[in-house]
A protein has these predicted regions:
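A conserved helix-loop-strand patch within extracytoplasmic ligand-binding domains
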Residues: 107-166, 251, 270-274
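Bacterial signal peptide processing site
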Residues: 22-25
Length: 306
């Protein structure tokens, strides 16, 4: 949930420690120190913990600088070397870095968007590593009962039923290409009615639970999906831009390393499914678990740390 994009906070000065930590056994070169940063909301903190802990478990000295503010504060900190690694979102970051789309524009394809993003990052001496399957973008959900009674698993499954269903979402949804307008143009879905609510917030959740709407727009990594047992419908015709999660790293750090940092961070992305991310978000946001504990448990479950 890129809610951090809309929150503003002052960024304190970050002291960069340049000295390398001790080498590993066997006479290999010393490992560079690493500073992992994040914007200011719980999903980012958990992702920052995942990156930090897998590096720490492999002998890296890591400084955590989380909750630094919105992207327009944190991205410059990454460029300038105040932090080295930042969890990011492909399509959103590409649109932020290349606002005019002169270098590349986000697409619905993860690989294409990654390629375009890398071209945009080259000037800032940054590298985007492998993206996870997990996303944080517009999603459409139904209750478990609705999904079960109508055998709904993907958005295209709504085709026989949409004419008798009510769609809920933000007031601008009917005219937005990634909301009702897109559902009509890409999926051929026309709903019986539309109920203006919020952007996947408590109004939408309550309307789904109260059967005031049949389909609701909720961000794909929102903790309510797990907490309320909603079914996130697969975007099988790729309506949404590819806002997959991926670590962005300073080239200067990668050049000091022997490839281990890249390999370790890519191993996190390879295991991070939508369901896994949503479960961690629910634990941290709803159950109020410590993101450090949640991240450690997930890394151990995936066999990435001992």
């Amino acid at each position: 949930m890129k809610r951090g994009n809309f929150l503003f906070a002052a960024l304190v000065a970050i002291a960069v420690v340049a000295s390398a930590c001790g080498g590993t056994g066997g006479g290999t070169a010393s490992k560079p120190d690493v500073i992992v940063g994040s914007t200011n909301f719980y999903e980012q903190t958990t992702l920052g913990e995942l990156y930090s802990q897998i590096l720490e478990a492999n002998g890296y000295k890591v400084t955590k600088k989380f909750n630094l503010g919105p992207r327009d504060i944190v991205y410059p900190a990454l460029k300038s070397g105040q932090i080295d690694i930042l969890p990011e979102y492909l399509a959103t970051l590409l649109a932020f870095v290349d606002k005019d789309g002169k270098i590349a524009k986000p697409t619905t394809d993860k690989k294409e968007t990654t390629t375009g993003l890398q071209k945009a990052l080259d000037a800032d001496q940054l590298t985007v590593l492998d993206a996870a399957d997990a996303t944080d973008q517009n999603g459409f959900v139904v209750t478990k009962d609705t999904a079960s009674s109508k055998s709904l698993k993907k958005i295209s499954d709504l085709a026989p039923y949409a004419k008798d269903m009510i769609l809920g979402g933000p007031a601008e949804c009917p005219t937005r290409p990634f909301c009702a307008l897109g559902l009509k143009n890409v999926y051929g879905l026309t709903f019986k009615d539309f109920k203006p609510l919020d952007v996947g917030g408590p109004l939408t959740v309550a309307a789904l639970e109260g059967k005031q709407i049949d389909v609701g727009l909720i961000l794909t990594s929102d903790p309510s999906i797990v907490a309320k047992g909603f079914v996130l419908l697969d975007d099988d015709k790729h309506l949404q831009l590819a806002d997959n999660l991926a670590p962005v790293v300073r080239n200067a750090l990668l050049q000091k390393d022997d490839g281990t940092i890249k390999r370790l961070l890519n191993s996190v992305s390879a295991k991070l499914s939508q369901a896994e991310l949503n479960d961690m978000n629910k634990q941290v946001s709803v159950d109020k678990a410590d993101s450090k504990v949640v991240a450690a448990a997930w890394l151990k479950k995936q066999g990435l740390i001992k």
